[in-house]
Amino acid sequence: PSYNYARFLDACLSSILMQDYENFEVLIADGGSSDGSLEIIERICAQDNRFRLVSTSDHGQADAIEKAFSHATGEFLCFLNADDCYLCVDALRCVVDTFNAYPSIDVLSLGGYYLDAHGHWTRPIKYRYHPLDGFHLMRYRTAVLQPATFWRKKVSDEIGWTTQFHFVFDVVFFYAAYQKYSWLELPKPVAGYRMHGDNKSGFVKSPRINELVKFEEIKFGSHSFRVFYLIGIGAVVRISEKMGLVGRLLNLLLYKLVNLLAFASAYRLPGI
């Protein structure tokens, strides 16, 4: 998916072009960019017929991904946002070799690094930093490094994408995949997750909290404590959003406090 990230798009597409595994297709769904992204996409597509622009309008990121995957012909799938990239030339080869070596796995999740806005590696991404964390806690904390996660085509064909979600659609998808399919986690860092200040999931926003509430309802039911807990947090966030700079500082404090409590409770309390 691509939308007004022209400043990162070249790096994203170039990281795919440099792969030493050549049997791939790239299906690009642009949401109507007006910053020069389409010109970059059209140039790459003209240079290499493995790249195709399949959509120029959508109703959000999940809808864009669903449209793109409707054209997919490959056996293994993933999606890479326009502000992210692959870090090594053998990322796709590693994925194909691993799936072929382990025919019983359906989802493969690899490692990655945070990048700054200039593409510099800053620190490794560690989603399993709690001593008790693991796949057995996926119901409480669906921790998946999206740009480094790949799956067999049948997974998304059967699960589909919840297009009513805009902030947590990927988490909803991966949780559904966790419930039904076999997973393998490997530490090899293949993907860069770019932190540039405009990341959609990088802020505490009331619409995102609302979606997390709906996600908890899917997992635990509408009357669970986790649902009411997040509803209360959402109410505080909505108030702070009207308070300018003070509100932003309050949101930052709330973000740290809620996630600290989630960690301390081994994620029996939800994070945000």
Enumerate the predicted regions with their spans.
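Short, acidic, metal-binding catalytic loop of nucleotide-sugar glycosyltransferases
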Residues: 14-23
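Short beta-strand/loop segment that forms part of the nucleotide-sugar
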Residues: 23-32, 52-57
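A conserved acidic beta->alpha catalytic loop
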Residues: 30-39, 81
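Acidic donor-binding/catalytic loop of UDP-sugar-dependent glycosyltransferases
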Residues: 36, 63, 84-98
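Glycine-rich, basic loop-to-helix element that forms the pyrophosphate-binding segment
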Residues: 55-72
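Short aromatic/hydrophobic "clamp" motif used to bind/position activated sugar donors
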Residues: 77
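Conserved donor NDP-sugar-binding/catalytic core segment of glycosyltransferases
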Residues: 89-122
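Conserved nucleotide-sugar donor-binding catalytic segment
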Residues: 110, 116, 124-215
